[in-house]
Amino acid sequence: MKKLPIFLTALSILTSTVSLTGCSKTVKPGDVQGYDEGEQYISMWVHTIEDTPEGEAYKESVERFNEKYDGTYFADIEFIPRNDSGGGYSDKINASVMSGDLPDVITVDGPNISAYAANGIIQPLAELSEEEKSAYLDSILDQGTIDDKLYALGAMESSVGLYYNKAILEEAGIEVPDKDHPWTFSEFLDILEQLKPIMDSKNGYPLDMTFPVGESSIYYYAPFIWSNGGDLISEDGLTADGYFNSDKNAAVFQYFRGLVENKYMSATPIENLFESGRAAFKFDGAWEVNTIYQSYSDIDLGVAPYIVSDNWNGGRYTPTGSWAYAATTKTEHIEAATELVKWMSGVDSGILLYENTKSMPSTYAAYDQITTFEEDENYKALYEQLRDYGHPRPKTPVYPQVSTSFQQVLEDVGLSGKDVQTEMDQSVERINAKLERYTR
């Protein structure tokens, strides 16, 4: 992605041209408890409340950093939670971009890293050695790398499972394939058809699937596009035409329409359909495992390999992405900021965050040290899927528009039966209109 002028775009980024220079507050030794003479001060903002399991993990990781680097660095964390609409934290960043009051390090939601980099909000990290980089999952490095430069490292990772009810599949005589031989789209349709009489008798559906407004739809279902050889945006992130509206993508959106038409899924959301035993399958985030274990222990849960196109070439395609740490363009101490980013995304911090929230770590060593990812078949399946097949969401400065457009086409074609080419072409017009400022 080429270097772009500082234009701030939708969702977490403003629409006006701004300057990153300004009068930020100077913090002196003694102003903050623990910050002593001779230490490099590093300010950091995170997107959550302090008094939560996630916030407590971040706070403890910072305390451990300050203990390890006592006399060299001092990290000062500030908690700026998001509100229900996703603002709050991003609003604070927007205002601080304009005033020049950004901290040295911020958390960035993974899909927005490209936009923050393109708009000059974050800068490349100081050089990491190959050994340091090899500690991280490929998906973490891929998500954080723009134009061959590493901008961010994940606080955590994520994945989406194709969950199944073991008792229902056993009743139907269906065997689940191994992770390297997932069901194809065609095979999955045959399985759903086989399950339909059983689920009809339970007043349910073979598949618990919805197309929710917001980030979930592209996060859950973009793999259908990727395994079919499609993309939603060009490699440089600057055009959607010929990508979002391709024949390959049209076939995928029509596939979703078929799921609705054949009544393999409900056209309207049904709360706890899978959890109540009235669906055989469900696509959901890794958090679903803990939800089932804690609240629906009567469900014998399994994780099947995420399904693939009949034309899948064996490449990466499964969902990834979560919050990451990045150094802002405000910082004049990139080496210090990078040390904090490495610490907060590293093994010990990842284990601590898992212990508090059950989120998936960013480093291989963290998985090796957390026995759950070896001993629990469901968590193990999610990790292996992430490790072997994880694919980042589209990298583009207008990612929010791509995400919104994907959900709109899913809903309009899948649920309402509108013409797929018309809906895709209209989405391309909207996406490319947002991209014009980056291609002038």
Features from the language model and the residues they span:
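Conserved N-terminal structural module of periplasmic/extracytoplasmic solute-binding proteins
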Residues: I6, L20-A115, E130-K133, P269, ...
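Bacterial N-terminal signal peptides
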Residues: T9-S19
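Extracytoplasmic/periplasmic substrate-binding proteins
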Residues: W45-H47, E54-A57, S61-V62, I218-P223, ...
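Alpha-to-beta junction loops
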Residues: V97-V108, I121-Q123, K202, S276-D284, ...
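Hinge/lid segment of periplasmic solute-binding proteins
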Residues: V108-G161, S186, I191, D200-N203, ...
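Periplasmic solute-binding protein
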Residues: Y116-I121, I140-D178, T210-G237, P319-A327, ...
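Long, aromatic- and glycine/proline-rich binding clefts that accommodate carbohydrate-like moieties
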Residues: Q143-G144, S297, A304, E355-Q408, ...
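Glycine-centered hinge/linker elements that transmit conformational signals in sensory
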Residues: L189-Q194, G230-D231, E235-A267
